[in-house]
Structure formats: C-alpha cells, structure tokens
UniProtKB/Swiss-Prot annotation:
The organism of origin for this protein: Streptococcus pneumoniae (strain Hungary19A-6)
Pfam families, per database record: Mur_ligase, Mur_ligase_C, Mur_ligase_M
Entry's localization field: Cytoplasm
Keyword Cell wall biogenesis/degradation: yes
Protein name: UDP-N-acetylmuramate--L-alanine ligase
Family, per entry: Belongs to the MurCDEF family.
Binding of ATP, residues: G110, A111, H112, G113, K114, T115, S116
Record-linked PANTHER family: UDP-N-ACETYLMURAMATE--L-ALANINE LIGASE, UDP-N-ACETYLMURAMATE--L-ALANINE LIGASE-RELATED
Encoding gene per record: murC
SUPFAM superfamilies in alphabetical order: MurCD N-terminal domain, MurD-like peptide ligases, catalytic domain, MurD-like peptide ligases, peptide-binding domain
Residues that span the membrane, as ranges: none
Length: 444
C-alpha cells in the first residue's frame, strides 16, 4: 500500500537518497529545505519530487514524516509545530533501522571511504540481482521486489545504532567529528557497539590497529594488502592511468584477477572488501569481476571535468586521511602533471583538532590554495582558529584565496586542480570554471 512521506531537510545527502528510493518504490514523496542550491537536489527534481520551503503548513497528520538529524524545535518551524501539536515523526536513522528489516541488508561503515564503497557494492550487486540502495552522495534506488538492501552506515552521533544488518564492511577507524566524539577510544567504542549488531559477516580492514580490536558475534573477515593475518588479500597490484588491476586470495585460494577503473590504493581496498562480502554471501565472482570493471565512482568523489583543456577534480575529502587518498589517486591518473590542491577546511572544531595533520596531508600536493573555513550550523566561530593558521604550517607553495578572486590558480602550467571540502568549495570551483571559460572567449 503506497504511503505519503514528507522529508524535513530533503536535500541532505542521506535524506535525498532515501526520498528517491521510496519514490521509486511507488510511494508519494515530498520534502522541505532551505532555498540554497545543493548538489543532491538535481536528482530529486529529475524525479519530479516536490521541494518546498520550510513551513508548518507542509505537515499533515496522514503522512509519514522523516526528519533530518540536524533539525530541532529551536531551529526548524516544522519540528516545532510537530512537537507542539503531537504530530509524530522519525529521524532518518530510526526510520532506516526499521525499514531494513524487510531485506537482506548490507551496511558500509567507517571513518573514511563509506560512500565510495557503498557505491561500489551497490553498483555490482544491483547488476547481479534486484537491489535497493542508499548512498551518501544523495543517490538512492528502490525496488518493491528487491531482496537485498545496501546502505551507508554513519557513525556520527552513533546514528548507526538502530541498524542490525546481516553483513557489514568497516573500512577504517579514525578520529573525526570532534564536536561529538571525545577521543579515538570514543570512536572505537561506537564502532565496536555497532559491530556487535552484525548477524552474518563482518568485513574489516586488517591493517587498521583499531579494527583489529573489534569484537562481534558474527564471523569477522579481515582484508588487506598483507598476506599474514588477513583472510582476503589483494596482491600483484598494477596501478596505471586507466585504473588498478590486482589479484585477490582468500586464505590461500586464488580468487582471480580484478580490475577497477578508479584510482588510489584506497579503492583497491574498497574493492577487496566488496569482493570478500559478495564471495562470502554466495555470489558468482565472475559476475562480480565483470561489474567491477564498469564502476565509475560516486558523486563528489574524484569527479572529473575538463574546462578549456584544464582538468578539474571535485572531491568531498575533508579529513587529512581522505586528502592523502585523493591526492594519491590524482598522481596515479596524472603522473606527469602538477597536482594543485584547493582546500576548504570544514568546521572550526575539526580544523583545530587536526591542524597539523591537515598541513601534512596538503603538503602531498605540489601547490596549495586555501578557502576560508566553512563553519557548521552546529557550531559558533569563537575566533580560536583561522585559515591562515593552517597556511602557516604548509611548506609547499600556498596562498589563501577568495571566491571572488581565484585568478592565482592560473599561475600553473600542465596542472590538475583538485578541489576538496565538505562545505561550499564548489562555489570556488565554479568561479574557476567561469574564469577559464572567459579566457577562452577572450582569446577568440
């Protein structure tokens, strides 16, 4: 029986993906959000899903309401109205926890690499069998007949605790979200609690010291590059400008050679995790091998475009570990080009906590340009950190730029520009694209 769903904060990456999935399953879907453009709304608009401004008139007692986790009575009129009038609603993660019970569910958790790995697993499995999925880049697919459900499992504020999937991958554990987690131990405890809820198989990166301490009632399979101590091992790596080729062994048994058209060592590990999970779940590895070859990536994860013969890469990287992985991927694909990083720090708390790590990561580039820190709606700028504090720690050529003047980026020949951040770094990217386009017009 089709239902009517209203999403409070429908442009959020998880929310938009869920809205698309429910829409494709035959339900009526609408939502509300701020008017500012966000990259997820294109998919919603293409699907014909109505996006409204926040207004208490949007709410109806006959609809099922799903609320974004950031919204509270003091910052959202719809939440305030619902609370005052006894209108029930579920948070995104609460809804998802009950929704997935109708499927064989496969989660992807981890401090970094969740979205790319969820996208890869969704791509392969949906080409093998009918599958519904939710990816953190705002992409969702729903099928009323699907047996399997693939989803991204987010650790922030322990949102993954309502989830009890049959299978899960955990890519890594790292200290992030310092506005919520107090320490690496706190992060570990959250992941360990989640791991205890997996029922059939847990796949963890075996070269992560924290993940080696994880416990679960489900069988734990380790994957990695090193033969000793890992169940699924990637070896014989060949990294080229067209992607990566590698061989996978399971406890000494050769599972064959695989190719992915994506870049960076981290993507080889993501693929090894996907191979391990699907092999253990009983899927034909020849089909897995075939469909890995066609996985082109997910939105805002090493997304490339060429403007006026200039290569521009857009990536969501906003943590030092992610920056290193993204720059490594850029060097693999463009070994003869200068790698120029354009980075916008995301949240003041993260910038303070990881300032030295950010500098170390950005020094992997040949030149670095910094945008002003993008503050989260959850925090207040007390003036404790400025982007210049990060700039002072970078030893490569560097400069702070504004969105109104990105012309310093033109000081490079034969360069690849890697724009990274989780805030509005894309406005800097678009400004640079307009500048490049105008150069072409002026020449003509």
């Amino acid at each position: 029986m089709p239902k009517t769903y209203h999403f409070i904060g429908i442009k959020g990456s998880g929310m938009s993906a869920l809205a698309l999935m429910l829409h494709q399953m035959g339900h009526k879907v609408q939502g509300s959000d701020v008017e500012k453009y966000y990259f997820t709304q294109r998919g919603l608009e293409q699907a014909g899903i109505t996006i409204l401004p926040f207004d208490e008139k949007n709410l109806d007692g006959d609809m099922e309401i799903i609320a974004g986790n950031a919204f509270r009575p003091d910052n959202n009129v719809e939440i305030a109205y619902a609370d005052q009038n006894g209108i029930s609603y579920k948070r995104y993660h609460e809804f998802l926890g009950s929704f997935m019970r109708d499927f064989v569910s496969m989660g992807v958790a981890g401090a970094h690499g969740k979205t790319s790995t969820t996208g890869m697993l969704s791509h392969v499995l949906s080409h093998i069998t009918d599958t519904s999925f939710l990816i953190g880049d705002g992409t969702g697919r729903g099928s009323a007949n699907a047996k399997y459900f693939v989803f991204e499992s987010d650790e922030y504020e322990r949102h993954f605790m309502p989830y009890h999937p049959e299978y899960s991958i955990i890519t890594n554990i790292d200290f992030d979200h310092p506005d919520y987690f107090t320490s690496l131990e706190d992060v570990f405890n959250a992941f360990n609690d989640y791991a205890k809820q997996i029922t059939k198989g847990l796949f963890v990166y075996g070269e992560d010291a924290e993940l080696r301490k994880i416990t679960s009632d489900a069988p734990i399979y380790y994957y990695g590059f090193e033969a000793e101590g890992n169940d699924f091992v990637a070896s014989d790596l060949l990294r080229s400008t067209t992607g990566s080729t590698f061989t996978v062994h399971f406890r000494g048994q050769n599972l064959g050679q695989f190719h992915i058209p994506t870049f960076g060592r981290h993507n080889i590990m993501n693929a090894t995790a996907v191979i391990g999970l699907l092999y253990t779940a009983g899927f034909d590895l020849n089909l897995v091998r075939e469909h890995l070859k066609t996985f082109s990536g997910v939105k805002r994860r090493f997304t490339e475009k060429i403007v006026n013969d200039t290569v521009i890469i857009d990536d969501f990287a906003h943590h030092p570990t992610e920056i290193i992985a993204t720059l490594d991927a850029a060097r693999q694909k463009y070994p003869s080009k200068e790698i120029v990083a354009v980075f916008q720090p995301h949240t003041f708390t993260r910038t303070i906590a990881l300032l030295d790590d950010f500098a170390h990561a950005l020094n992997q580039a040949d030149a670095v340009y910094l945008a002003q820190i993008y503050g989260s709606a959850r925090e207040v700028d007390h003036g404790d950190v400025k982007v210049e504090d990060l700039a002072n720690k970078i030893n490569k050529k560097h400069q702070v730029i504004t969105v109104e003047n990105v012309s310093p980026l033109l000081d490079h020949d034969n360069a690849v520009y890697v724009f990274m951040g989780a805030g509005d770094i894309q406005t800097y990217e678009y400004s640079f694209e307009r500048l490049l386009s105008n150069l072409t017009s002026n020449v003509q």
